[in-house]
Swiss-Prot record:
One of its GO terms (molecular function) is ATP-dependent protein folding chaperone. Residues 612-631 are annotated as: Disordered. It comes from the Bacteria. Induction: By stress conditions e.g. heat shock. HAMAP family: DnaK (MF_00332). Keywords: ATP-binding, Chaperone, Nucleotide-binding, Phosphoprotein, Stress response. The keyword Glycoprotein does not apply. The gene is dnaK. The modification Phosphothreonine is found at residue 200. The keyword Signal does not apply. Gene3D superfamilies: 1.20.1270.10, 3.30.420.40, Actin, Chain A, domain 4, Substrate Binding Domain Of DNAk, Chain A, domain 1. This is Chaperone protein DnaK. SUPFAM superfamilies: Actin-like ATPase domain, Heat shock protein 70kD (HSP70), C-terminal subdomain, Heat shock protein 70kD (HSP70), peptide-binding domain.
């Protein structure tokens, strides 16, 4: 059985790790980096770029470069958060036939799970290259505050990428696993994980206990905001730059997608720099042009200015911390350690606010970019049965219930209930002789159902005629370890039942997922062909270069016929390499042709080298004899070994 890898599928960056024995390995991607930008670019020639290559070309291809897609996953187009993003993103966010938020690139409509699958495929390939074997199973992390639709959509993304998702695990819980297993402290500890990533914010209160030599991680409570993260901090800087430039130059950059993409890059850099310095300069020449000529942007931003711009965003993270502490039934003073996760927690103002709330310095010994992937890899090892000393007890982040008479939300499972869990309740009909009931399932904390997230609905039909209140309908809610809900309803009189895994009126159908898997496999085959073609071209280029060099050095040792034959083969290989439509077979044939034609040239080179080596050997023997005489005279000299001392 292959290894189960751990993937942190982030809004801004993603990371993959695997356990090797008791050691965790965060795997470098093909560019040599331990994290991969969650950016996907769709090119004119149908090529798909993922990660750093996609990020590099984003300025020149803003409409087809997709980033922060995690903010849309499992969301409806009408949601206010999605509507807010429509005005900010350079790419198109569109309404799918089922009412979900999808994106568009090169006129192609794409579901967020389909786009996220490209990042997951890159993570899968990264792990396969390192392990040297196929990888088919993964643990994927999600924000703790993700609802059922978002979790289901993340699972779908894994399937489209060719991965069996063994478990969906909450990001703060994964970070706690990484932290807890790394520490030798015995006894019970309560920790707070404050996770402020690129697009989402979570806080979880977790108790780590030693139970009979086993480390038990029990999530006491969780809270958060799935639409608050580093991207929002970047946006504040972008808005500020646009405002300042408009005041100075009278030009509104918000309507220029190319300028916006450059501003986004500059804002992110400025934010990062201001975590370690007090001031930074944003310098973007030729940002735009008007009738008077090109315009350049030059602006200084201080750390104090940035803090003023984002003050309310940092403040917004504190209320969920308050609620999480209250829901966990603990006091702030009971918290032993505060762990910071997510790149945005590197901002000094964020650290200061966290310290102020929890009354203690956050731990600095957890890598905020890698801890989540490390925890996912540990959970992968637990699920594969290779690790027995860890028990993870997670919770459902939001209450689940059904709509009952008067539009009321009747809770079946309260938030922060340990999962997996199951709950049944008996309900009855609202009207006389009612033959069917519609069960609408909601997730959220509001008293009225309409204020919560509708996860899905289904009918139980064939109820025998009876006065209202007589039929007994048992509704069962079952949440699995992934936090995904399964619902069943049963008429106790007839035994009729109807079971569903909650699939909102949104989400991808099985047929759509299967089609996306097929498309992905076709793309993978196409990518493989492109890679092989590139390898053949590189081999051809290298052979052209080495043959030309050899001809210039040894060509005069060949007779005219041989030389002409090589030159003709060389020209035909160069011609085929210049032809952009040439396929691998055509290039390989010309490479072979030149290889055969150059055989005589190779023989001449080899003979020449041997002759040179022979001459050098003879000269060496003569020199050795001369040195032998000199050695006799030097016999009374003391030998000493010297070592080079390198100074740091």
């Amino acid at each position: 059985m292959g290894k189960i890898i751990g993937i942190d599928l982030g809004t801004t960056n993603s990371c993959v790790a695997v356990m090797e024995g008791n050691q965790v390995k965060v795997i470098e991607n093909s560019e040599g980096a331990r994290t991969t930008p969650s950016i996907i670019a769709y090119m004119d020639d149908n090529e798909v770029l993922v990660g750093a290559p996609a990020k590099r070309q984003s300025v020149t291809n803003p409409k087809n470069t997709l980033f922060a897609v995690k903010r849309l996953i499992g969301r409806r187009f009408e949601e206010k958060e999605v509507q807010k993003d429509i005005g900010l993103m350079p790419y198109s966010i569109i309404k799918a036939d089922n009412g979900d938020a999808w994106v568009e690139a090169h006129g192609q409509k794409l579901a967020p799970p389909q786009v996220s699958a490209e990042v997951l495929r890159k993570m899968k390939k990264t792990a396969e290259d390192y392990l040297g074997e196929p990888v088919t199973e993964a643990v994927i992390t999600v924000p703790a505050y993700f609802n059922d639709s978002q979790r289901q959509a993340t699972k779908d993304a894994g399937r489209i990428a060719g991965l069996e998702v063994k478990r969906i695990i909450n990001e703060p819980t994964a970070a706690a696993l990484a932290f807890g297993l790394d520490k030798a402290e015995k006894g019970d500890r309560k920790i707070a994980v404050y996770d402020l990533g690129g697009g989402t914010f979570d806080v979880s209160i977790i108790e780590i206990a030693d139970v009979d030599g086993e480390k038990q991680f029990e999530v006491l409570s969780t809270n958060g905001d799935t639409f608050l993260g580093g991207e929002d901090f970047d946006q504040r800087i972008i808005d500020y730059i646009i405002g300042e430039f408009k005041k100075e130059q009278g030009v509104d950059l918000s309507k220029d997608v190319l300028a916006l993409q450059r501003l986004k890059e500059a804002a992110e850099k400025a934010k990062i720099e201001l975590s370690s310095s007090q001031q930074t300069e944003i310098n973007l020449p030729y940002i735009t042009a008007d009738a008077s000529g090109p315009k350049h942007l030059n602006l200084k931003i201080t750390r104090a200015k940035l803090e003023a711009l984002v003050e309310d965003l940092v403040e917004r993270t504190i209320e969920p911390c308050r609620i999480a502490i209250k829901d966990a039934g603990v006091k702030v003073s009971d918290i032993d350690d505060v762990i910071l996760v997510g790149g945005q927690t590197r901002m000094p103002k964020v650290q200061e606010k966290v310290k102020e709330f929890f009354g203690k310095e956050p731990r600095r010994d957890v890598n905020p970019d890698e801890a989540v992937a490390v925890g996912a890899a540990i959970q992968g090892q637990v699920l594969s049965g290779d690790r027995k000393d860890v028990l993870l007890l997670d919770v459902t982040p939001l209450s689940l219930g059904i709509e009952t008479l008067g539009g009321v939300m009747t809770k079946m499972i309260s938030k922060n209930t340990t999962i997996p869990t199951k709950h049944s309740q008996v309900y009855s009909t609202a009207d006389d002789n009612q033959s069917a009931v519609t069960i609408k399932v909601y997730q959220g904390e509001r008293e009225m159902a309409a204020g919560n997230k509708l996860l899905g609905e289904f009918n139980l039909e064939g109820i025998p005629p009876a006065p209202r209140g007589v039929p007994q309908i048992e509704v069962t809610f079952d949440i699995d370890a992934n936090g995904i809900l399964h619902v069943g309803a049963k008429d106790k009189a007839t035994g009729k039942e109807n079971k569903i895994t909650i699939k909102a009126n949104s989400g991808l159908s099985e047929a759509e997922i299967d089609q996306m898997i097929k498309d992905a496999e076709a793309n993978a085959a196409e990518d493989h062909k492109l890679r092989e073609l590139a390898d053949s071209r590189n081999q051809g280029d290298a052979l052209v270069h080495s043959t030309k060099k050899a001809l210039s050095e040894y060509g005069d040792k060949l007779d005219a016929g041989e030389k002409e034959k090589i030159e003709a083969a060389l020209k035909s290989l160069e011609d085929v390499l210049k032809d952009t439509s040439a396929d691998k077979a055509a290039i390989d044939a010309k490479v072979e042709e030149l290889g055969k034609a150059s055989q005589k040239l190779g023989e001449k080179m080899y003979a020449d080298m041997q002759a040179q080596a022979g001459a050098a050997g003879a000269a060496g023997a003569a020199e050795g004899a001369a040195q032998g005489g000199a050695q006799q005279a030097a016999d009374d000299v003391v030998d000493a070994e010297f070592k080079e001392v390198k100074k740091d």
